[in-house]
Amino acid sequence: MQKDQLNRKKYLPFVIGTLIWGVTVLWINFHGAQWFNFDMFADASVAKRMAEQHSFFPKDWVFGNQYYIIATPAIAALFYSIFHNSVLSMSCASSLMFLLILLCFWWSFRPILSKPALWSGLFCMAGATILGDSISSSTYGFQILYTMASYYACYLLVLLLHLGIWIRMGKRLPVSRGLLLLALTASFTLGIQSQREMLTLCIPFFLIALLLWMRNKSDSGEKKTLVFALSTLGMNLAGLLCNGYIRQHQGSRYLSNVSSIEDAGHGSIGTRFFESAKAFLDLVGIRYFQYGWKWKPLALLGMLLLILGLTALVLCLKKKDRMGSRVLLFCWLSLFGVFAAGVLVIQVRAIYYFVWYLLIPLSTALLFEHLSGNKKKSFFCVAVLLCGAMNYFYNVYPDAAKYQTQKQFYSEIVSWLEENGIRTIYGDYQTPTIAACSGDRIEFCSVFPNMAANSDEQSGLLVPYGSPVATERYRDIEPEQSALILSDSPYDEMSGYRYLENHLSEPYHSRFDACFSQQACFESAQVTYYIYFFSDPDIIA
């Protein structure tokens, strides 16, 4: 009994911390429409079209971000058939994926970690090590894993599923055929979506399994792991090949194949080496050293997490923790694979290193497991909790501070539009937030000033701009129920209004003024929206 009470004391603070992070993520998901940026709204729109057309591949689209099979937008499509609200559906789907990640983390590492260690890792997994300045919209973690259109959540889930199976094979524990089939099917569907799983899971997993089998060919467990890794690689490759044969109905005027990762470009090896390394350091949090003194603690925390990840690997090797060290080696190899691909093959974005968000929670849990002595463990617990509290302040406080102001700002715009009978808005990439706050009562179609109209008076003044909307919304325009909205942001030279003012010719301005009449202007500290009415339905090239 005393031992159980002692164990509870060890992990109770982590339980409370995990619950705080969890409640915060859920609150953001269901109150975050005013943070919906272009990509988030695009994914919510994808879910809506999937539900309406009962297909993962909606027809006649201008541009959908990628194929979605088991990603959050695909899950949101199921919720849309119930709620008929794309933003609410995406909130439900993102929250479900968040909970599944936490549950899958627990299930995956339960065979090698005690409950206190698992809870310390779960606390970090819930967000304590995702360093950023906005829990709702940070593309360095929260938005792509947990909040509002969490696209990368599916990759992390499938990775955890495979690691859990690998650990059970290594520990000689039974693994059901249904679980194996689920993992292989998931690998196939992610292959259809993109090449990310091939890079972060399939290749490093196969290489480690192959090396371990070559070292000990007589071990049946190593042989099973190799067969599983090879099957995963094969299924993912089959998905990639299937991607090439699926007829794409999106009809994009801008991208012929939106499901592939961008190539590395034509820079030198040295340049690409620097860019790939910078992307990794950006994700880790060391990027904050370049900002003011307010952000220096977050940069220091990023350095500490980097040291923590390396220390955990050394300690596991020293303690001869076979499975713990193998999984950590896999995570490091996965990160190195992304880095190498960035140097040799693709153009790396920071979020491609998302395995970091698994490496640090796992490192935390393994350190907690292997530290000897109550004093060391107590100090480690306090340090981890303080780091989590500091990160919570940096991530949550900025959103909480401006929540009410932003909510009121966008509510006023939506009310004005509805009072004037507007059902469709055409605008640049900073305006979908307005449609998100309307709860699907107002439809958004993305447009941008047409540079070609500078010299061609017959060309339309606007062009579609990467929006996941059926192309009929650009053909069958109803001016009496439509408005053009252009944004002006002091932080963005490519905001629609600023681009119009600074980059287009006098003849274009004359045509624009003759076609559009400004009706309203809404201004906040971050952005100003100019609303125009028009009567000519042929405004789009």
Question: What does each model-found stretch correspond to?
Answer:
Residues 150-158, 199-200, 296-304, 325-373:
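Hydrophobic/aromatic-rich transmembrane helices and adjacent perimembrane loops
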Residues 441-531:
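Luminal/periplasmic acceptor-recognition loop/helix of membrane-associated glycosyltransferases
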